[in-house]
Amino acid sequence: LSSPGVSRVVLPGPQSDLAAIQRLLDRRSSAVLDRDRRSFMSSIARTSPDFVRRQARLFKAMVGVEFDSYRLVVRPDRFGDLARPSDVRRYSGADSVLIPVTEERYRIRGFDTEDAAEDVFYTFVKKEGQWRIAEDADLDDLALFSARHLWDGGRIEAERSDRFLQYKHPCTGPECDAPTDDFLDLAERALDQVNRYWTAPWHQEVIVLVPNGTDELARMLQATIDLDNFVAFAYSTVDVEHDLDYTGHRIILNPNAFESQTTQGVFTILAHELLHIATRDASGPFMPVFVDEGYAEVAAYDGDPSGLSFFNSQVANGDFDKKLPRDFEFTTGSGTEIYESYQEAQSAVEFFVGRWGNERFVDFYRALGRADIAPGTTRYHLDRALRGAIGMGYDDFEKAWASSIENS
């Protein structure tokens, strides 16, 4: 029998084993901060030569990261022991095999005010009384992927400006898809533009990550969708230890798509992603995509009439269904269909800001973002926030927006 709302997690192993695993993780964490290669590598079992090589490369790259803090915390209370019989058989020479969730928590000096928090699925093996880490990819076939960072892909180098830190892999030659030399200057100007829209306080030090290609990008994002239609991403970790807070805000570039952009295109993209970073701490579980993406586009184009040229041509051709885009329409369909959803969202938010003002929109966004996990759908909470801000619900807002398009 079970009661509603009550779940049972089987804790992996005796407390003495969990305590020993945590001590192992503490030593590994200290080795990262102390840049102690010997101590770091001593935490690794020698069962997989590939894993040992990857860990050696990881440590070498992490030396280039200015960590303000770094911790690994075993969390058996999350999902218990995830090791299957097949995982245990894989390490037949071990006395014991455990795969609990491990939280990786860290801060980059000068940029993170809260812990970035991500899950790692280490396989811990016990042999001759000693626990070590044997692998971090044994659960990939279950789509339980360990977090991958830019430094997992090899050595990195840093570039700085007043409010930005950019990490990328060293690369020279014509095959490199690296941002231009004026990239950080453009980022600084884009941030100033964003501040004219998002007037609420936010932490204005931003990290930009530049992977080598879409394969590395997809692994960092744990994405299964086609990334070719996307130039950059605003990425945040979710800290389950502190009420599902968004932390560890980053902008991650798609280098393959980025290289074809004009200077103005780069500026617009940066402003869009920075708006997401600026609003992230005010967002919440009931924020629809059209509100987020629409406001980012409004801030990015900053009143430029060309920003809605595609949408206007669609309307002129009679291709306008008078409906606000739904969340799934921003990630599925053709590139043209996805772009159309962004344009519709931009038009809707532009309508809101034009009629009721930017400050009213900021208040509306913050009110909607404050909605805690509670009964009711996203539509319910959105409807409630709209009524509080402008005196009309979702359906009436949608009709008013559509009418403004038809009568323009």
List each model region and its residues.
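Acidic/His/Gly-enriched intrinsically disordered linker/tail segments
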Residues: 237-248, 264-269, 281-408
